[in-house]
């Protein structure tokens, strides 16, 4: 529950920024939010591994899907905000969008599932963010 609340807070705080600040801080805010979530997950790594690997039938079984839905909604809000700044209209097939966002979260949680040492997980998470940021910039016309 707490990681979901943390994620929602990061999204909400970002949406409170002015449109110009959102554009300028997109990557840094995403990176710091991912780092906070990573730190939180590693503080309770064994619990998170159980949630990620053995939560079928519990209230946690859809954790990643819930995060994906929140991220997709936040992406739409961000795209609309960017349109007001003069950026092109955001057009993406909803299935592809869902696949891309699901891929991000699945990849993010792989460090827990595969017991990646924390220092490596930090590096991988930063590279994951860089990779996805570049792709989203291309898709969004930045």
List the predicted regions and their residue ranges.
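Hydrophobic alpha-helical connector segments
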Residues: 2-43
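Amphipathic alpha-helical packing segments from all-alpha helical-bundle domains
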Residues: 28, 32-43, 58-84, 95-102
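Hydrophobic/aromatic-rich alpha-helical bundle segments in the mid-to-C-terminal region
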Residues: 78-131, 140
């Amino acid at each position: 529950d707490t990681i979901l609340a943390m994620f929602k807070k990061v999204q909400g705080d970002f949406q409170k920024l002015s449109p110009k600040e959102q554009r300028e801080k997109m990557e840094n805010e995403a990176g710091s939010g991912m780092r906070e979530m990573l730190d939180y997950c590693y503080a309770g790594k064994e619990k998170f591994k159980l949630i990620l690997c053995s939560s079928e039938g519990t209230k946690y079984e859809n954790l990643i899907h819930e995060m994906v839905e929140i991220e997709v909604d936040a992406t739409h809000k961000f795209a609309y905000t960017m349109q007001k700044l003069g950026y092109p209209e955001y057009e993406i097939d909803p299935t592809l969008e869902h696949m891309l966002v699901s891929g991000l979260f699945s990849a993010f949680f792989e460090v827990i599932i595969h017991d990646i040492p924390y220092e490596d997980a930090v590096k991988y998470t930063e590279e994951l963010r860089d990779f996805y940021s570049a792709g989203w910039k291309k898709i969004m016309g930045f």
